[in-house]
């Protein structure tokens, strides 16, 4: 059976890649840190969770609640995992970028 894979927005790609990099440690705080460290962008919790909820509805990620912890006032962490459809969506986006970059000569930009 073929998996229906929706097109990804740029931030959705970033979030999926952060989850894949973090593995079983992917929850809100660690994802925001990973995105910040890798992209120099600091997404707000609202932007991140809105995107995660939308991607869960699309079937790109699934979430589960961990155990409540005293450090979080008895609240549980919500962990995320990329589904097969999410992996395929990332792969499709990466293929599209490679195709667009093929043969393109980008100017060298010096970083200050």
Q: Model-derived features: where do they sit?
A:
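N-terminal helix-turn-helix DNA-binding core of bacterial DNA-binding proteins
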Residues: 5-47
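Alpha-helical residues within the helix-turn-helix
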Residues: 33, 56-57
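Beta-hairpin "wing" of winged helix-turn-helix
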Residues: 58-73
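Amphipathic alpha-helical dimerization/coiled-coil segments
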Residues: 85-112
